[in-house]
């Protein structure tokens, strides 16, 4: 087990998460007693208690007053906030995880972008207009792309879409910094934002579905060509 966390709390958190992932503490099992676990990891019981509370909030554990702490099946109890952690734990599955993430983005974007352009066109155009001043480099485009999708999600009037994008932010922007290092990807994205702006101005809301789907397919083709050179630190994150 290789743990790169810098603080005692970060070390304890990664130790427990990796132990769950590697079935040292399998789903459905009971964690060792607090005293035993703190000695095993090498942190104070106060630090361990804080870590356990945080992991419980993220869905990894269930803490019940007066009862042992139970390990959850995190696939059933956690949220999008653990995406980066999953990518870090299983490097071989990162391409599939990213494919799934981008597929979800495209599927829900066909709904919230159409709604935003139809119900709140002025707000949608304000969001899309931010692309006019973007600097031509990967970091700027990664931030822009996330903010445009998130902005349109909230412009749809249904904040749940925005919350979903919030949950994707960490891994989404890390992917974006690699993806948008390709000039072809940046050019395709600008064309996509421009098309959406045109559809909004002309009231062609029914064409949003096809435009978003086409962009998802074409950007996916670029991404798949780039997957052979995924940076090793794509999902690295330490507390």
Swiss-Prot record:
Known PROSITE patterns for this protein? HTH_GNTR
- Does Membrane show up as a keyword for this record? no
One GO BP annotation of this record: fatty acid metabolic process
Which gene specifies this protein's sequence? Answer: fadR
Q: Which GO terms describe its cellular component?
A: cytoplasm
* UniProt protein name: Fatty acid metabolism regulator protein
Domain of life (superkingdom):
Bacteria
The protein's job, in short, is: Multifunctional regulator of fatty acid metabolism.
UniProt subunit comment: Homodimer.
The record's InterPro entries line, in alphabetical order, gives: FA-response_TF_FadR (IPR014178), FadR_C (IPR028374), TF_FadR/GntR_C (IPR008920), Tscrpt_reg_HTH_GntR (IPR000524), WH-like_DNA-bd_sf (IPR036388), WH_DNA-bd_sf (IPR036390)
DNA-binding region residue numbers: 34-53
Asked whether the UniProt record includes NAD among its keywords, one would answer no
> Where, by residue number, does the polypeptide cross the bilayer?
none
The UniProt entry, under PANTHER family, shows:
FATTY ACID METABOLISM REGULATOR PROTEIN (PTHR43537:SF52), TRANSCRIPTIONAL REGULATOR, GNTR FAMILY (PTHR43537)
């Amino acid at each position: 087990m290789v743990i790169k966390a810098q603080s005692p709390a970060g070390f304890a958190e990664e130790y427990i998460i990796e132990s769950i992932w590697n079935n040292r503490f399998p789903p459905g099992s009971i964690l060792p007693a607090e005293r035993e676990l703190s000695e095993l990891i090498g942190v104070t019981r106060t630090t361990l208690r804080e870590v356990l509370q945080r992991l419980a909030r993220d869905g990894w554990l269930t803490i019940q007053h007066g009862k042992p702490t139970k390990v959850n099946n995190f696939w059933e109890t956690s949220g999008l906030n653990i995406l980066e952690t999953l990518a870090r734990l299983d490097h071989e599955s990162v391409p599939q995880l990213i494919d799934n993430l981008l597929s979800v983005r495209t599927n829900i974007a066909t709904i919230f972008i159409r709604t935003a352009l139809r119900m709140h066109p002025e707000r949608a155009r304000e969001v899309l207009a931010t692309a006019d001043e973007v600097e031509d480099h990967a970091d700027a485009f990664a931030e822009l792309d996330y903010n445009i999708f998130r902005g349109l999600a909230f412009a749809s009037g249904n904040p749940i879409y925005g919350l979903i994008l919030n949950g994707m932010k960490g891994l989404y922007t890390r992917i974006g910094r690699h993806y948008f290092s390709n000039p072809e990807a940046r050019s395709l994205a600008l064309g996509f934002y421009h098309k959406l702006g045109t559809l909004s101005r002309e009231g062609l809301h029914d064409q949003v579905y096809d435009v978003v789907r086409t962009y998802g397919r074409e950007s996916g083709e670029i991404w798949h060509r780039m997957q052979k050179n995924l940076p090793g630190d794509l999902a690295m994150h330490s507390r």
